[in-house]
Amino acid sequence: MSETKRRPGGHPGMRGPDVPGEKAKDFRGSLGKLIRHCKPFYPVICIAILGDLAGVIIRLIGPNKISEITNLITAGLRGEIDMPAIQKICITLIILYVVGALLSFMTGLVMTVVTQKVNRGLRDGISHKINRLPVSYFQSTSTGDVLSRVTNDVDTIGQTLQNSLTSLVSAVTMFIGSVVMMLSTNWIMALTAIVSSMLGFGLMLGIMSRSQKYFVARQRWLGDLNGHIEEIYTGHNVVRLFGAEQREQQAFDRINGKMQETDWKSQFMSGLMMPLMGFIGNFAYVAVCVVGAVLAMNGTISFGVIVAFMMYVRLFTSPLSQLAQAATNLQSAAAAAERVFEFLEAKEMPDESHLPAQTKTVRGEVAFDHVRFGYTPDKIIIHDFSEHVQPGQKVAIVGPTGAGKTTMVNLLMKFYPLGGGEIRIDGVPLSQMTREHVHDLFGMVLQDTWLFEGSIRDNLCYGKEGITDEQLDQVTRATGLYHLIHTLPEGYDTLLSDKLNLSAGQKQLMTIARAMIENAPMLILDEATSSVDTRTEMLIQQAMDTLTKGRTSFVIAHRLSTIKNADKILVMRHGDIIESGTHEELLQKGGFYAELYNSQFEQA
């Protein structure tokens, strides 16, 4: 029952230029990074490859043994067939093929284990990376795109490792081994098979060079498609409210069409390879049969050599199909690896491990000293913000949309680095405090009520352990939730789900109760009553007054009636403080705050 926030930015799915795709920035580099990521599994992978190579050697021995059987049978047609010799060869073949089957099973099992561990490692890396990325990254990247990297791209990499790594090695070995065996058997027939098969290589390389850009585009459009679906699903009510179903459907159709186009092109290119390799293989097979028949009639080779060559041609051409499929999978893996490692290598927040540990005792004195900030150098939001907040004061920050209210809170929480000036808590600059410590100092109640699937107890005690029912009762009484919760069959253990229809006000009260349980020394209340009715607003306001008592609090609100009792009101406009004082003082001035306040009552 979580409420997912929509990402800031443009319209969902509007990802920029309508380009069907482009080549990977660094195809070899992406594969190189993936190979280095698999370094802990090198020994196991080598064992799997060696097992696969042993299986290939066994398959290469088979045609030679079958050739011997054929020659023994052919020679016996004029007299007596040497059955003991044939039985001996057959037993040898059975043993070899059983060993080959066991090696194949072992290779598949080992690569499955390696693949799962690599996938888990990549997902763990992405999960840990998320906690080290700045807030600005998530404001410029859709949630669906990040999810696509965690799921689709990692799965693509895993499938390539499992299905293509060993097959690529075995295909190369089989190709080289079959060439050696054919040349050692009869060079004329070997050249016939090789020349007739080489036609496929040029075509395969040409297709590969043209298809890579479509595989890259497919992964990118898949990320956009996931992002669009995730946003429209979570914001479905808003879409219906504004009658934007047709507009969103058109956006979905556009992205889905691009996805279909690039997917069709990539699969079309991929689909060309297998029929092409099949044709080349059959053509080589026919050529070998014709040339072999001529040589046999001339007495140059025996009939057993023709039989062996028929099998060697299959062994020679089948790696071409495997190489084609492996090349296709590698292109998909390269595109996926590029996106995954692009995320893993994204710029992180600065390392703060060198900062000294801070004391837990906090008075709550906050000073803003000529703070300056801009999301970009040419877009300054906060020009010169200075203010001193005493311990325990309740400070309200008001102003029109875009004035910089939420930006100041983000700077106070160290979500963004300052562009200039300094913020101090109890005389200690934020630059000398770790982000984790700053976050521990503040409890937050936001307009967007974030509740996750789980019990009411889990949501109220989020991040806290050892909270008793008595403590929960005390907090829920203070927030007006006690009666609601105790009328539920499971009480605090009731699971939040779609069946439990909590109102917006009840959800807001739960977030206030959660902040009470957190018991942080300072508070940030961001427009916590702007989406509820007047009666619920009064309940929330009472709970907030209880919550802020004795704590340094920063309140951002559009409803100015909720901050009358604030110790200080800061009026912001265009990133600067234009007025400061109590509610009564600001009304007496008759300035911008008075205009805002009076306009709200005129509208009411």
Please name every model-derived segment.
Residues 1-59, 74-93, 107-111, 115, ...:
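Membrane-integrated ABC transporters
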Residues 14-22, 116, 124-148, 152-154, ...:
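Short intracellular "coupling" helices and adjacent cytoplasmic loop segments at the cytosolic face
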Residues 40, 135-136, 154-161, 165, ...:
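An intracellular "coupling" helix at the cytosolic face of ABC transporter transmembrane type-1 domains
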Residues 75-77, 82, 181-195, 265-338, ...:
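Helix-loop-helix
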Residues 109-117, 121, 184, 202-224, ...:
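Cytoplasmic juxtamembrane "membrane-exit" helices immediately C-terminal to transmembrane segments
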Residues 352-353, 359-604:
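ABC-type nucleotide-binding domain
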